[in-house]
Structures are given as structure tokens and as C-alpha cells.
Amino acid sequence: MRETVHLGCEKCTRRNYHTTKNKKTTTEKLALKKYCKWCKEHTVHKEMKL
């Protein structure tokens, strides 16, 4: 079953994106390089608690 997860910027810790992932097949935390409008640059966004 897919669940919604929030992605937060590592620099400013703001939650800028949300996506879904299958928690049964992907047990580790998701980390993607995305654009943060608060930092005004591309940073790593990691999965955070809701």
C-alpha cells in the first residue's frame, strides 16, 4: 500500500514537497535533490515525519 510522505529541505528544514512511496518495498528514507524556494537553490530533500 502506498503512503504519502513529506520531503523537507536539509538546510532550512521546511517541508516543500510531498509524494507517495510503497513502504513495503522501500524501507529506507527517501532523499531527492529538489529546488527549495526558501533557500533559492537545489538542495537534498529527505523524507520527514508528518
UniProtKB/Swiss-Prot annotation:
PROSITE patterns: RIBOSOMAL_L33. InterPro entries: Ribosomal_bL33, Ribosomal_bL33_CS, Ribosomal_bL33_sf, Ribosomal_zn-bd. Disulfide bonds: none annotated. Keywords: Ribonucleoprotein, Ribosomal protein. GO terms for molecular function: structural constituent of ribosome. NCBIfam families: PRK00504.1 (NF001764), PRK00595.1 (NF001860), rpmG_bact (TIGR01023). This is Large ribosomal subunit protein bL33. It comes from Sulfurovum sp. (strain NBC37-1).
